[in-house]
Design a protein with these regions (language model features):
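Canonical tetratricopeptide repeat
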Residues: 506, 540, 574, 608, ...
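Start-of-helix register in tetratricopeptide repeats
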Residues: 468, 502, 536, 570, ...
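Alpha-helical repeat scaffolds
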Residues: 520-526, 555-560, 587-594, 619-631, ...
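Long, contiguous interaction/recruitment modules in multidomain scaffold/adaptor proteins
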Residues: 367-465, 637-639, 700-721, 727
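Acidic, contiguous internal or C-terminal segments within carbohydrate-active enzymes
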Residues: 81-82, 88-107, 166-217, 356
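Extended, loop-rich substrate-binding clefts of extracytoplasmic carbohydrate-active enzymes
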Residues: 48-74, 78-82, 130-188, 309-344, ...
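TPR-adjacent "capping" and linker segments in tetratricopeptide-repeat scaffold/adaptor proteins
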Residues: 450-471, 656-665, 735-743
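A contiguous, surface-exposed recognition patch within enzymatic or periplasmic domains that forms
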Residues: 32-42, 79, 97-100, 108, ...
Length: 804
């Protein structure tokens, strides 16, 4: 209003400036970090037996087998983000989850916050606690870090927003995930920006679902656009009215049968949510359809079988439902159903970035349409229509009602976030009209024109095994980390059709993954003798030659691979890495920049650029690259380490060490070290490990890098094997080196585990058998018994007896 008046008084002008400045100051979002005591039913009893026989897909993680029946107060780190409209709470020590979120004008939770931390045996590793938003990456299930600390940083941004970035490595795939929880200064809701990248040269499993919780209540109605829902198998069913006439979009009509998973599909839309009809508030999620098409509802059974989980997971907060957003249509579990749904792979050296919004609604009756900037609900009567609006931002603009795409009504409104605006107009029920609110990116039409033409059923297909169907099945196995199954299927295909170059390429990749480089190059060479220009075969050949140090043939093969747009950025990045290894830093920079032309966020290329510029003393360019990496991944440990290398002060050393905050810090130190080692930066690789926690695998790497054999025997003798789970293909050569230099059963045992994890079961069994009854450690015998079970009953029984 001040700006509409002519200002003549200087004093008043100064006062106006002060008032605006104060208003600007108070409109900033704020972020706080503090410890909070919460009633906790804790978990304990980590299991030292490798998970390889139980769930090899998540090795090297281990399970927790103890769960408290009684609670105690326990302190947790809380990151609180707040502006004038909402409060958001993050728990970096509990998987980085959003603990809950509150709409301040009503005090209602639009993200369910469980006031107790009640761990129960639900996740892949066991402990899981309900509520908030859980970030799941990697493989179907509650991710392995869901109950343990992850890395995090907090930021106060120039635009007045605040952010908490959480993230971790998914160890089996070695992919890196980050989620930025961002709260703008004048926004009724918050954003999450996910960054997930695959820094490996291999295909990895691809799974992402953001699992949010909301209170369960009989008046809850789900606004989830679509005309079908899919089961985990991909089987299609009717939505929202099922075959029995139940309206599944109403919580109270789900009072039948077991717990439910509804993956709702069929409509090209960007939002879904829920509304409590009697309480007058609700929650919602927004994300571009091309980024986050998956929308799932999880409902506990309303019988006692579901009700017991209210007692098991909460004390006084009541039952909850989950509304989940995913990168795919379905949380897919392979079964006998024939349909178009499948698992997919994460392409080598690729990165995915997407944004989502989580918001409250109040006093509007439901959600007919929503964007990241506002939500509307339409109420139709016989002779009139009511439009209810919640903006999430300051909104000074037009609401347009169109009939036959011609303006019927237009209103100018000036609203603040979470204002409730209602307009009633004369359009009879049954007449189609359109609502356009351009400034809020809302465009809604009462006749649904957003149903998609996509089949979710394959009833017309006859199940017939062909080489192509078997190949598709093998690719599914790779995406589901069933590498042994995939290998056998690919071998069968190649036996029947030696010209199936796709099968040859993937089989070579599996052998590379397993550290079997001779087998890998032999199979790939057979394919290249059929098709010398094949980009996939050349790419796999290139990474194999690079691994065995044949850089000429690696660069030659990668050059051909780079002609394909699929491999261009990745292949050029690998050539840049070889140039760095060969100490041709200018070439490393040149190839990295070429790689970035085709993927500007290629983390591997940016890493090579940072290291090369530092080695050339290009301080300004070095800093620019670190700034670029930080803009993509503020948690990346290379940032603090490279800064330490430039300025090796005590403060920078502490910053580097403290940047590793996750549960398994030894693994994040080792992952960074191996990255430098693979680039022939051996001094830096050793330095990283020396500054990290003491751990047998890491210490063996230190000895290997420095070729220090003198204290190797003492090192191994003085360390326990408990919770030492080597899994990287690079560590195989370290353990083989140690085995060749000392005689100690622990090295053989660790090598056997590493080989088993890579599908090299015969080699692993041989090592286990050769150890006979030499080890004096009960966990060795339990581990051998669990892995060798079924191969020899007498040996299994003997191992169990020795353990106990």
């Amino acid at each position: 209003m001040f700006f509409m008046k002519k200002i003549r008084d200087k004093t008043f002008t100064y006062l106006l400036i002060i008032l605006i400045s104060i208003n600007y100051l108070f409109s900033q979002s704020k972020i706080m970090e503090y410890d909070k005591s919460l009633l906790t039913y804790d978990f304990s009893d980590p299991n030292p037996i490798p998970i390889l026989s139980k769930n090899p897909k998540i090795y090297p993680y281990f399970t927790f087998d103890g769960y408290d029946l009684n609670s105690e107060q326990k302190k947790f780190k809380i990151i609180e983000l707040e502006n004038d409209y909402v409060q958001v709470f993050v728990m970096p020590e509990v998987g980085g989850k959003v603990w809950g979120a509150i709409e301040k004008s009503t005090g209602n939770e639009f993200i369910y916050r469980n006031e107790v931390v009640k761990y129960r045996n639900i996740s892949m590793r066991g402990p899981w606690t309900s509520g908030g938003i859980e970030f799941n990456f990697g493989l179907i299930g509650h991710h392995p870090s869901t109950a343990t600390p992850v890395d995090y940083v907090i930021q106060e941004n120039e635009d007045g927003s605040v952010s908490c970035i959480v993230g971790n490595i998914d160890l089996p795939s070695r992919t890196q995930w980050r989620v930025k929880i961002n709260l703008p200064k004048d926004y009724a809701g918050f954003f999450t920006e996910a960054v997930w990248y695959n820094p490996t040269p291999l295909h990895q499993s691809y799974y992402n679902w953001m699992t949010a919780a909301a209170p369960a209540a009989n008046d809850l109605e789900f606004f989830t656009p679509g005309n079908a829902y899919l089961e985990h198998s991909g089987k299609s069913n009717n939505w929202p009215i099922n075959e029995g006439g139940k309206n599944l979009s109403k919580y109270n009509q789900n009072n039948f049968g077991p717990s439910k998973s509804y993956h709702v599909v069929g409509e090209f839309n960007d939002f879904f949510g829920g509304y409590y009809k009697n309480s007058g508030y609700g929650y919602g999620h927004w994300g571009n359809y091309e980024d986050i098409p998956g929308q799932k509802l999880w409902l506990w059974s309303q019988s006692r079988s579901g009700g017991i989980w209210e007692d098991l997971l909460t004390d006084t907060d009541g039952q909850y439902i989950e509304f989940q957003a995913g990168r795919l249509f379905v949380q897919y579990l392979p079964s006998g159903d024939v349909n178009p749904i499948s698992n997919v792979s994460f392409e080598p050296n690729s990165i995915d970035i997407w944004q989502e919004s989580w918001f409250p609604v109040k006093e509007i009756g439901g959600i007919s349409d929503a964007s990241q900037y506002g939500a509307i609900y339409i109420i139709r009567d016989e002779d009139s229509t009511t439009l209810n609006l919640n903006p999430f931002i300051n909104f000074n603009g037009k609401i347009q009602i169109l009939l036959d795409d011609k303006k019927y009504l237009e209103e100018n409104v000036n609203l603040q976030p979470m204002d409730v605006y209602k307009m009633k107009f004369k359009i009879n029920e049954g007449i189609n009209f359109r609502v356009k609110i351009n400034d809020l990116k809302i465009d809604y039409e009462t006749i649904n024109k957003k149903l998609i033409k996509r089949s979710f059923s394959s009833h017309t297909l006859k199940i017939k095994e062909t080489n192509q169907s078997l190949f598709n099945s093998a690719i599914q196995d790779i995406s589901y980390r069933d590498f042994d199954k995939a290998k056998e299927k690919l071998k069968k295909i190649i036996e029947e059709d030696p010209y199936h170059t796709d099968a040859i390429s993937y089989l070579g990749e599996i052998h590379y993954r397993n550290g079997e480089y001779k087998k890998a190059i032999d199979i790939i060479y057979s394919g290249l003798s059929i098709d010398t220009y094949n980009p996939s075969l050349n790419y796999i050949a290139g990474i194999i030659y690079k691994e065995i140090g044949d850089y000429i043939n690696s660069k030659e093969s990668l050059g051909w691979a780079s002609r394909s747009i699929k491999y261009r950025s990745n292949a050029l990045s690998k050539i840049a890495e070889i140039s760095l290894i060969e100490k041709d830093y200018e070439a490393a920079i040149s190839y990295s920049n070429k790689s970035l032309e085709y993927n500007s966020n290629n983390i591997s290329s940016l890493e090579v650029l940072a290291i090369s510029n530092r080695l050339l003393s290009n301080k300004e360019d070095h800093q620019k690259i670190l700034t670029k990496i930080e803009s993509i991944d503020p948690i990346h440990h290379i940032l603090s380490f490279e800064k330490f290398l430039i300025d090796p002060s005590e403060i920078n050393k502490t910053k580097f060490i403290n940047s590793h905050r996750s549960e398994l810090r030894n693994e994040t130190f080792l992952e960074l070290s191996i990255r430098y080692f693979n680039l022939d930066q051996t001094k830096e690789a050793q330095m990283i490990l020396m500054k990290g926690p003491r751990h047998l695998t890491n210490d063996l790497w230190i000895s290997y890098i420095s070729n220090n054999k003198d204290k190797l025997d003492d090192l191994v003798k003085s360390n326990s094997i408990n919770f030492i789970f080597p899994f990287r293909r690079e560590t195989i050569k370290v353990l083989e080196w140690a085995k060749n230099n000392i005689s100690n059963w622990k090295v053989d045992y660790l090598l056997a585990l590493n080989l088993w994890s890579k599908g090299r079961h015969d080699e692993s069994r041989k090592l286990f058998k050769e150890l006979s009854d030499i080890p004096e450690n009960e966990n060795f015998y339990l581990s051998r018994a669990s892995l060798m079970e079924g191969s020899n009953v007498a040996s299994y029984n003997d191992d169990i007896k020795k353990a106990y």
